[in-house]
């Protein structure tokens, strides 16, 4: 088997309107195609709608076919976008286990939840991998195999899991970037939980779930998607944001009351009840304003019932 990496614009001619590229094939790949597939061509034509939006293609990596389809990785250049002038319209994000991203819009006080299917995907693949592993290892043990090895099926399941999760994270972060562009948001502030992951002990089962969540990948995907629209991306240290009332004078240890964060994702403050993750997103933005020296009134009216946005898996 051979994989091919085509570098440079001289090897790639594009018809941008049609979403088609024509590739000049290197000798080694032409020989491989002739001997393996009896294909005698000097050029390879690829047509896909994704090529329409691409600027200068820098590299194409083509991998051998599996079950009738090829894997192609395209590396292309995107021109730098100048950061937009700050207009005071911001979005804050609280990252969590069951609600992957809970968002707060500073202009209208709207809150919404993205990424609920993530945990469902993780659970499905964990169960399926565990089931197949138990069967496979049982078969090997029955045959007296001393050193148990993994199987092709298990490796493919891990790959499917990785690809499915990556695809879903791209869809969720793309939805968020498009929302910000359409609404005229110029700054996105997300809670920075990297230190929390290292330092907190939340119990064995919660630790296991919490430490497996791909927050770094979410940060990277969000940052480059927002950057394309000139939207500023900030990671804000988020201590006490989930424990302080949205009505407290400030977000900090002095006003933290963990007992007010109740079961089923609720935060109770006297006779007022809010969604706990929405409170977290709201307080992350308050904390960012505090450390930035910004004084701005924010609405708490949308903290009770966030809208749940469904993104197709």
Positions of PLM-derived features:
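Single conserved hydrophobic/aromatic residue that forms the stacking wall/gate
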Residues: 1-13
């Amino acid at each position: 088997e051979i994989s091919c990496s085509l570098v440079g614009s001289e090897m790639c001619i594009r018809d941008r309107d049609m979403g088609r590229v024509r590739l000049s094939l290197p000798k080694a790949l032409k020989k491989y195609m002739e001997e393996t597939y009896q294909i005698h061509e000097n050029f390879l034509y690829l047509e896909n709608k994704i090529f329409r939006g691409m600027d200068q293609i820098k590299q194409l990596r083509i991998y051998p076919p599996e079950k009738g389809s090829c894997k192609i990785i395209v590396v292309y250049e995107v021109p730098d976008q100048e950061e937009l002038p700050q207009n005071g319209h911001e979005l804050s994000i609280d990252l969590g286990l069951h609600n992957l991203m809970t968002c707060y819009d500073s202009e209208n006080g709207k809150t919404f939840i993205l990424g609920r299917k993530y945990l469902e995907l993780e659970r499905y693949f964990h169960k399926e991998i565990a089931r197949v592993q138990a069967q496979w290892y049982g078969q090997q043990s029955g045959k007296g195999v001393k050193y148990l090895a993994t199987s092709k099926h298990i490796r493919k399941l891990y790959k499917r899991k990785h690809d499915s999760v990556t695809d879903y994270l791209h869809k969720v972060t793309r939805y968020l970037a498009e929302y910000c562009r359409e609404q005229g948001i110029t700054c996105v502030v997300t809670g920075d939980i990297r230190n929390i992951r290292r330092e907190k002990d939340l119990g064995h089962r919660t630790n296991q779930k919490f430490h497996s969540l791909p927050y770094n990948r979410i940060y990277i995907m969000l940052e480059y998607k927002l950057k394309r629209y000139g939207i500023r991306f900030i990671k804000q240290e988020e201590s006490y944001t989930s424990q302080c009332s949205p009505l407290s004078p400030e977000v900090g240890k002095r006003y933290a009351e963990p007992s007010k964060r109740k079961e089923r994702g609720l935060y109770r403050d006297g006779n007022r009840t809010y969604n706990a993750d929405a409170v977290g997103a709201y307080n992350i933005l308050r904390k960012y304003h505090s450390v930035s020296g910004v004084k701005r009134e924010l609405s708490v009216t949308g903290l009770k019932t966030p809208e749940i946005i469904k993104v197709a898996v």
